Structure formats: structure tokens, C-alpha cells
């Protein structure tokens, strides 16, 4: 028994129509239609080959159908990781090396490592035992089970065979059959099945009368606001506010006794840079007197009154020096003693010799 795949079936096709079409080349054991594709089981292999040769691209209800041998789902394989591969190694050489231990489904080299899909798990175990840590083209390669979860099934490794349709010469990602087994070019059937595409919205952006009316009203409102808030109106309002503020401030000032100053303040042509010196007041006179006293005291304390640097001349007594009319209260002896102290040389005096004399005064 040979299983055939029929793709791109029209919606009008029925199982009886497909069965009668394939019975022209041999006995049909089973016929199933699933949406726009189906499967036909023919008893004889030769009859299946004749049906493929004659019915492939056969036009049925105006649609070309595809007839080919059905490919079973890929069996679970064992994926091996091969590391430290020589840069001169090719896929064919690596495949031949692993085929010594069993059938190889796919061999893919990525830079200095590769992935090899073995058909049977026991063959993969034997390949690991025989090839791990062995020399291959001048480098010691490492073979172990792959732990990668990406693309665990074979396919898309090279163009030697597509795991979707089984044909050679194209990548699996370029296969016309999608992952569900359907032919990828089904645009017409898709439109017929799910309905035509909705016509685009043809009304232009400016066709809405409501939009135009609304925009015009907003434009008119903007123009009115702009005219009301012109520069001249704003300047006039500012000048009026300033005049009111100046009048209110002047009315709150106290009455000025000086008529000349009052007339100057109330005049309209005020000069902010016009400054006049104020007449001297009582406080200013007091300050001038204090300055004169300070100058007199400075000249008084600046005179030299040291007895050691006194100029030569007649020595005045205490009574004569004070001149306050108290000569009778001071004795002549005390005056003579004090004068004798001033006449002594500095180096002849002792520090504590005349303490009794100082205590008498």
C-alpha cells in the first residue's frame, strides 16, 4: 500500500470525485479529504507512480492540484554535539566518519563545532564511545549528547534533503509546504474560504462637513481673541493702571510743610535723578560739635608730658604747676622731695628704695 498526498484541493471537490479520479490507475483502498488537502491509499506501488505522473498539477474545478508521495513524520533521532573540529573539515567527511556507527540523518557544521543527528539511539552511544577524544584531521574532537533545546529535530542543516517534503535542492525553511503540511501558496483559496478583503475607506480627510465647520468656528474665535488682545490695548491698560497707582501713592503721603518741596513733589515733570542737599539740622550740628571735641582731645593727649624727656629750665613746684589756688595745702618739703626724685638719674634709683615716700602721698 502506498499513501499519496493531494494538496491544493478546491472547495467543490468531494471524496467520491477524488476516488473515481485515482481509480483510473489502480485500486484505491482509502480516500480522505481534510479541508483543502487529502490522502489517497493505493494498493499497488506502480499504480501510485502512474497516478503521480498523470494527476500532478491536474486542473480540478479550475484549480491545479498537487499529487505526490506522502512522507511520514520524522522519527525521533538522537542529536550529538561534536566539538573542536578542524576548519578544513566538510559535512561529507564528518558524515562519513559517523556513518561507520549507524545511519546519519543530518550533519551540520557551525564554525569549529557541529551537530550530528543519528537515526537510532544505540548507534549514537556507540559513536560517542568510539569517537570521543580521538584524532580527526589533526585535532582531538569531543563527542557528546547535545543538550540544546533549539531544533532538536533534524532539518535545515544543509540542502541535501528537506525534512518536510523529503526533496533535495532547497532548505527546509524554503519548502513550499508549511509546518502543517499544507502548500504555502493558497491565496485564492484563503480569500474564498474566509471572504473577500474589506474595501478600503475611500472618504478623504477633508470630506467631513462637521470637521470643516468646527475648524472654521475655532478660527473665527481665535481671530476675535487676537484682535481683543492687541498690543495697543495692552499698552493702554498698563498706562492707566500705573496712573491710578501713582495717584493713590501720593494721596497717602503726609502733608509737607515746605511749599517749595510740596510743589516739587506734585509737579508732573519729576526727575528721578535730581538730588538736592538738605539744610543742616540739629542732629547735624551735634555731630559737628562732637567731631571738634574729638580733635581737641587728640591734640591734648598728643603732647609730650614724660618727666624724663622734659626740656631744661626752671622747675615748677606742684602748686605752681596746678595753678588752682591751693598752694597753702601743699607743703614745701613734699614739693622739694618730689623735685629731687625727678632730678635723680635713672640708673641710680633703686626699685624699692622710695616705697615709703610714695605711701605718704
From Swiss-Prot:
**A GO MF label:** RNA binding
Q: How does it assemble?
A: Interacts with TNPO3; the interaction mediates nuclear import of the protein and is disrupted by nuclear Ran bound to GTP. Interacts with EIF4G1 and WT1. Interacts with EIF4A1; the interaction is modulated under stress-induced conditions. Interacts with AGO1. Interacts with AGO2; the interaction occurs under both cell proliferation and differentiation conditions and in an RNA- and phosphorylation-independent manner. Interacts with DDX5; the interaction occurs in an RNA-independent manner.
Question: Where in the numbering of this chain does the RRM domain appear?
Answer: 2-72, 78-148
Q: What biological-process terms (Gene Ontology) are attached?
A: cap-independent translational initiation; circadian regulation of gene expression; circadian regulation of translation; enteroendocrine cell differentiation; entrainment of circadian clock by photoperiod; glucose homeostasis; insulin secretion involved in cellular response to glucose stimulus; IRES-dependent translational initiation of linear mRNA
Gene Ontology, cellular component aspect = cytoplasm; cytoplasmic stress granule; cytosol; nuclear speck; nucleolus; nucleoplasm; nucleus; perinuclear region of cytoplasm
Instruction: Tell me how the protein is altered or processed after translation.
Output: Phosphorylated. Phosphorylated in vitro on Ser-306 by SRPK1. Phosphorylation on Ser-306 is induced upon cell stress signaling, which alters its subcellular localization and may modulate its activity on IRES-mediated mRNA translation. Phosphorylated. Phosphorylation on Ser-306 is induced upon cell muscle differentiation.
Keywords on record: Activator, Cytoplasm, Differentiation, Isopeptide bond, Metal-binding, mRNA processing, mRNA splicing, Nucleus, Phosphoprotein, Repeat, RNA-binding, RNA-mediated gene silencing, Ubl conjugation, Zinc, Zinc-finger
Compartments reported by the entry: Nucleus; Nucleus, Nucleolus; Nucleus speckle; Cytoplasm
Q: Name one Pfam family in it.
A: RRM_1
General function of this protein: RNA-binding factor involved in multiple aspects of cellular processes like alternative splicing of pre-mRNA and translation regulation. Modulates alternative 5'-splice site and exon selection. Acts as a muscle cell differentiation-promoting factor. Activates exon skipping of the PTB pre-mRNA during muscle cell differentiation. Antagonizes the activity of the splicing factor PTBP1 to modulate muscle cell-specific exon selection of alpha tropomyosin. Binds to intronic pyrimidine-rich sequence of the TPM1 and MAPT pre-mRNAs.
PTM annotation (Phosphoserine): residues? 86, 306
Q: What is the protein name given in its UniProt record?
A: RNA-binding protein 4
Q: What segment(s) does the record annotate as region Interaction with TNPO3? A: 196-361
Q: What induces it?
A: Accumulates according to a circadian rhythm in the SCN.
Q: Which stretches of the protein fold into CCHC-type zinc fingers, per the record?
A: 160-177
Show the CDD domains listed in the entry.
RRM1_RBM4 (cd12606), RRM2_RBM4 (cd12607)
Q: Which residues form the signal peptide?
A: none
Q: Where is this cross-link: Glycyl lysine isopeptide (Lys-Gly) (interchain with G-Cter in SUMO2)?
A: 79
Entry keyword Iron-sulfur: no
Instruction: Please classify the protein's predominant subcellular localization into one broad category.
Output: nucleus
Expression sites by tissue: Expressed in the suprachiasmatic nucleus (SCN). Expressed in myocytes; expression gradually increases during muscle cell differentiation (at protein level). Expressed in the suprachiasmatic nucleus (SCN).
SUPFAM superfamilies annotated for this entry?
RNA-binding domain, RBD
Q: Which InterPro entries match?
A: Euk_RNA-bind_prot, Nucleotide-bd_a/b_plait_sf, RBD_domain_sf, RBM4_RRM1, RBM4_RRM2, RRM_dom, Znf_CCHC
Q: Which SMART domains match?
A: RRM (SM00360), ZnF_C2HC (SM00343)
Amino acid at each position: 500500500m502506498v499513501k499519496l498526498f493531494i494538496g491544493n484541493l478546491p472547495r467543490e471537490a468531494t471524496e467520491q470525485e477524488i476516488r473515481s479520479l485515482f481509480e483510473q490507475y489502480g485500486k484505491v483502498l482509502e480516500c480522505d479529504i481534510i479541508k483543502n488537502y487529502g490522502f489517497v491509499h493505493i494498493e499497488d506501488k506502480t499504480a501510485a507512480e502512474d497516478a503521480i505522473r498523470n494527476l500532478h498539477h491536474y486542473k480540478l474545478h479550475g484549480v491545479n492540484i498537487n499529487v505526490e508521495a506522502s512522507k511520514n513524520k520524522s522519527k525521533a533521532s538522537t542529536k550529538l554535539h561534536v566539538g573542536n573540529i578542524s576548519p578544513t573539515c566538510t559535512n561529507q567527511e564528518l558524515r562519513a566518519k559517523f556513518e561507520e556507527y549507524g545511519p546519519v540523518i543530518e550533519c551540520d557544521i557551525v564554525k569549529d563545532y557541529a551537530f550530528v543527528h543519528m537515526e537510532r539511539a544505540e548507534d549514537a552511544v556507540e559513536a560517542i564511545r568510539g569517537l570521543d577524544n580521538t584524532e580527526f584531521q589533526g585535532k582531538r574532537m569531543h563527542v557528546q549528547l547535545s543538550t540544546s533545546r533549539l531544533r532538536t529535530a533534524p532539518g535545515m542543516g544543509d540542502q541535501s534533503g528537506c525534512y518536510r517534503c523529503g526533496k533535495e535542492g532547497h532548505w527546509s525553511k524554503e519548502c513550499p509546504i508549511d509546518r502543517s503540511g499544507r502548500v504555502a501558496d493558497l491565496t485564492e483559496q484563503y480569500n474564498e474560504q474566509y471572504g473577500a478583503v474589506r474595501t478600503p475607506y475611500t472618504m478623504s480627510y477633508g470630506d467631513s462637513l462637521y470637521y470643516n465647520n468646527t475648524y472654521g468656528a475655532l478660527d473665527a474665535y481665535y481671530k476675535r481673541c487676537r484682535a481683543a488682545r492687541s498690543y495697543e490695548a495692552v499698552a493702554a491698560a498698563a498706562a492707566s493702571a500705573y496712573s491710578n497707582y501713582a495717584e493713590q501713592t501720593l494721596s497717602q503721603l503726609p502733608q509737607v510743610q515746605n511749599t517749595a518741596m510740596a510743589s516739587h513733589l506734585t509737579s508732573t515733570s519729576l526727575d528721578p535723578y535730581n538730588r538736592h542737599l538738605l539744610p543742616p539740622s540739629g542732629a547735624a550740628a551735634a555731630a559737628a560739635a562732637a567731631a571738634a571735641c574729638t580733635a581737641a582731645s587728640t591734640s591734648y593727649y598728643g603732647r609730650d608730658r614724660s618727666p624724663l624727656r622734659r626740656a631744661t629750665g626752671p622747675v615748677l613746684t606742684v602748686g605752681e604747676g596746678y595753678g588752682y589756688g591751693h598752694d597753702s595745702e601743699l607743703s614745701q618739703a613734699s614739693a622739694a622731695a618730689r623735685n629731687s626724685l625727678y632730678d635723680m638719674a635713672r640708673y641710680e634709683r633703686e626699685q624699692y628704695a622710695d616705697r615709703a615716700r610714695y605711701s605718704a602721698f
